[in-house]
UniProtKB/Swiss-Prot annotation:
Biological processes, Gene Ontology terms: cytolysis; killing of cells of another organism; programmed cell death; regulation of single-species biofilm formation on inanimate substrate
One Pfam family per UniProt: LrgB
Name of the protein in question: Antiholin-like protein LrgB
Xref: HAMAP family: LrgB
InterPro entries assigned to the protein according to its UniProt record, in alphabetical order: Antiholin-like_LrgB, CidB/LrgB
Membrane topology (UniProt): Multi-pass membrane protein
Similarity-based family: Belongs to the CidB/LrgB family. LrgB subfamily.
Predominant location: membrane
Gene transcribed to yield this protein: lrgB
Length: 233
């Protein structure tokens, strides 16, 4: 019955995405934002487990899932809003911001590429991993454009964000990074959306820098990843 209904309506995929995310958001707040209960991570795990246990094929979910994905690309326009609001900070520290984000993103791409090549991952897997520095709304279109697997890219983005959310501030202490601009840029560049949360806990400067990094990293990924693909593949 479930399978029959799912095959004939996109509502199944939409509800399987939205309801677990909504419930996970409540759980996330109730547990004092415990990193393993990050909404994206929980809803992803639940969705995969549900499809596996019920035997419903992924293509059935994808009918509704593609509708949500359709709205991701125009949603990227919204990222211009926080950038505009923080334009004074951006102008004042533009050289540090551009330098930090540019170098950080390129180094991250080189590390991913080197590790993946040493591990002898298939090319489509490597291509799926490269855009993970950007937030999901930007990473998925980039992945599709270079021949990656969108679903694998989504997983990489989420896991990357969860790790930075959980350990980002610990890494800053480990490497004794105390400058608020550097700390904010580091968290925003490495952890995208989830990286802003620990930056907010550190202070307003860190939060501003992380928010700016979140947007600009997406721009760098869009510009640089295709160049990496052209050079190394």
């Amino acid at each position: 019955m479930i399978n029959h209904l799912a095959l004939n309506t996109p509502y199944f995929g939409i509800l399987l995405s939205v309801i677990p995310f909504f419930l996970a958001t409540i759980l996330f707040e109730k547990t004092n934002r415990f990193f393993l209960f990050a909404p994206l991570f929980v809803s992803m795990v639940f969705g995969v487990a549900f499809l596996y246990l019920t035997g419903i094929p992924y293509k059935t979910y994808k009918i509704g899932g593609d509708i949500i994905y359709f709205f991701l690309e125009p949603a990227t326009i919204c990222f211009a809003i926080p950038l505009y609001k923080k334009r004074e900070v951006l102008v004042k520290h533009w050289h540090r911001i551009i330098g930090g984000i540019g170098i950080g993103t390129v180094v991250a791409l080189l590390i991913i590429l080197t590790f993946a090549k040493l591990a002898q991952f298939a090319n489509d897997v490597i291509l799926s991993m490269l855009p993970q520095a950007a937030t999901t709304a930007i990473a998925l279109p980039v992945s599709a454009g270079i021949g990656g697997i969108k679903e694998l890219t989504s997983l990489a983005v989420i896991l990357n964000g969860v790790i930075i959310y959980a350990l980002g501030n610990k890494f800053l202490k480990l490497f004794r990074i105390t400058n608020p601009i550097a700390r904010g840029l580091a968290l925003g560049t490495s952890g995208h959306t989830l990286g802003v949360a620990p930056a907010k806990e550190l202070g307003p400067v860190e939060e501003s820098m992380a928010s700016i990094a979140l947007v600009l990293v997406g721009v760098v990924v869009v510009a640089v990843v295709p160049v990496f693909v052209a050079i190394f593949f």
